[in-house]
Amino acid sequence: MEILTTTFLSLGLAADAFAVSLTSGFSIKHIKLNKALKIALFFGCFQAIMPFIGWSAGLTFRDFISSFDHWIAFGLLSYIGGKMIYESMEEEKEDKKFNPLDSYTLTTLAIATSIDALAAGIGLSVLKGSILLACTLIGFITFGLCFIGVFIGHRFGDILNQKIEIVGGVVLILIGTKILLEHLGFSLV
């Protein structure tokens, strides 16, 4: 697979993670470099590892995995999005709000947004080319976009301020719905 094709694949796979990093940026009150790095590393690493896992599984499990991967992504993103919306409407302590820096939350979001990368890895297993190059490029592009996305999201969160978590929750649910509909055969473009 040539580098240009892999770059476009990487950008496509990174799009959902970028959108989620924007949402994460909305929720961070005091942005610091280490917070953006943590989010970007989670997404970049998962996006880099999942194609390798998919490639390793190869054609043997393609039909099995593709029959339910979209439901997992939809469920995880809808759950977290719904939780964000619910928590933004509560008048509870701030520490109970959506925390995009929590390792459990980050892992869940990273898995949900990298399921397409797993499927892409299965597809890559039938092509000639370097899986190492593909995984590296996918990981670095996702890392870069997510790092920038956290800062952009934070900036918009500062500007819009009130109830931005509702917007973030809706974005996550929409991403999950998009993944589900695309895998069910609906074209959204």
Curated annotation (Swiss-Prot):
<feature type="transmembrane region" description="Helical">
    <location>
        <begin position="65"/>
        <end position="85"/>
    </location>
</feature>
<keyword id="KW-0464">Manganese</keyword>
<keyword id="KW-1133">Transmembrane helix</keyword>
<dbReference type="Pfam" id="PF02659">
    <property type="entry name" value="Mntp"/>
</dbReference>
<dbReference type="InterPro" id="IPR003810">
    <property type="entry name" value="Mntp/YtaF"/>
</dbReference>
<keyword id="KW-0812">Transmembrane</keyword>
<dbReference type="GO" id="GO:0005886">
    <property type="term" value="C:plasma membrane"/>
</dbReference>
<feature type="transmembrane region" description="Helical">
    <location>
        <begin position="166"/>
        <end position="186"/>
    </location>
</feature>
<comment type="function">
    <text>Probably functions as a manganese efflux pump.</text>
</comment>
<feature type="transmembrane region" description="Helical">
    <location>
        <begin position="39"/>
        <end position="59"/>
    </location>
</feature>
<comment type="similarity">
    <text>Belongs to the MntP (TC 9.B.29) family.</text>
</comment>
<feature type="transmembrane region" description="Helical">
    <location>
        <begin position="106"/>
        <end position="126"/>
    </location>
</feature>
<feature type="transmembrane region" description="Helical">
    <location>
        <begin position="8"/>
        <end position="28"/>
    </location>
</feature>
<keyword id="KW-0813">Transport</keyword>
<keyword id="KW-0406">Ion transport</keyword>
<feature type="transmembrane region" description="Helical">
    <location>
        <begin position="131"/>
        <end position="151"/>
    </location>
</feature>
<protein>
    <recommendedName>
        <fullName>Putative manganese efflux pump MntP</fullName>
    </recommendedName>
</protein>
<keyword id="KW-0997">Cell inner membrane</keyword>
<keyword id="KW-0472">Membrane</keyword>
<dbReference type="InterPro" id="IPR022929">
    <property type="entry name" value="Put_MntP"/>
</dbReference>
<keyword id="KW-1003">Cell membrane</keyword>
<dbReference type="GO" id="GO:0005384">
    <property type="term" value="F:manganese ion transmembrane transporter activity"/>
</dbReference>
